[in-house]
């Protein structure tokens, strides 16, 4: 028989700034640039008109609440990329250490005390020390945003849930290369996280910091 305290657990929890981290997944020049914009106009439009404005608002709100903001970028640790996962080698993901492609988009650039984690796998928990950092900081809730919804965002949501965090996904702060892919991914991992809009989370931040 299930314990009473377990049966009462819920994903619908109040916003606690000290225990919450905004995580921006792969919001970098490699993922969105003029060449990608021409090739994938839907993605370009979503990034420009929806995702970047929402991320900017979220970053400002988290900084204002003195809550953690963290970034991941796909970036080799070595010049020749030997440290990459086998899948990244097979997929030809080669983002040189310190390159323009590895840099976070200017519109949502990290603050001087935000953490930026280079990763060489789809799942941030697999190739960085993010779990160690989150535990040290006292984070139990991870707001997952960024690119791509059906790839690295999906990985992060599921892995965070498996590691005992409370993942929150904001569909209007994520994007991928088609609406079908975006919606299918959100539906597939919905059971692993709480889903909110950017406006709902911003309202929760205001309520928590009055």
Which role fits each region the language model picked out?
Residues 28-34:
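Short acidic, Gly/Ser-rich segments with clustered Asp/Glu that frequently serve as metal-coordination loops
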Residues 1-21, 57-65, 87-210:
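Active-site-adjacent betaalpha module
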Residues 18-20, 36-62, 66-74:
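A short alpha/beta connector and helix-capping loop motif
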Residues 27, 74-76, 172:
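Active-site loop/turn elements of alpha/beta-hydrolase fold enzymes
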Residues 66-69, 73-92:
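Early exported N-terminus immediately downstream of N-terminal targeting peptides
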Residues 21-27:
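N-terminal nucleotide-binding beta1-loop-alpha1 segment
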Residues 36-43, 82-86, 160:
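Surface-exposed, active-site-proximal loop segments in enzymatic domains
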């Amino acid at each position: 028989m299930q314990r009473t305290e377990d049966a009462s657990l819920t994903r619908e929890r109040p916003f606690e700034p000290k225990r919450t981290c905004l995580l921006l997944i792969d919001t970098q020049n490699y993922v969105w640039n003029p060449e990608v914009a021409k090739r994938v106009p839907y993605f370009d439009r979503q990034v420009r008109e929806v995702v970047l404005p929402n991320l900017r608002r979220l970053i400002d709100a988290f900084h204002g609440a003195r809550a953690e903001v963290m970034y991941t970028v796909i970036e080799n640790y070595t010049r020749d990329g030997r440290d990459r996962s086998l899948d990244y080698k097979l997929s030809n993901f080669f983002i040189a250490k310190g390159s323009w492609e590895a840099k976070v988009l200017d519109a949502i650039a990290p603050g001087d005390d935000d953490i930026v984690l280079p990763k060489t796998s789809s799942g941030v928990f697999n190739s960085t020390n993010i779990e160690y950092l989150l535990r040290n900081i006292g984070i139990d809730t991870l707001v997952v945003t960024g690119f791509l919804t059906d790839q690295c965002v999906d990985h992060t949501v599921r892995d965070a849930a498996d590691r005992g965090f409370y993942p929150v996904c904001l569909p209007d702060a994520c994007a991928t290369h088609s609406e079908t892919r975006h919606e299918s991914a959100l539906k597939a991992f919905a059971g692993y996280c709480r889903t909110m809009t950017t406006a709902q989370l911003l309202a929760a931040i205001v309520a928590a910091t009055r």
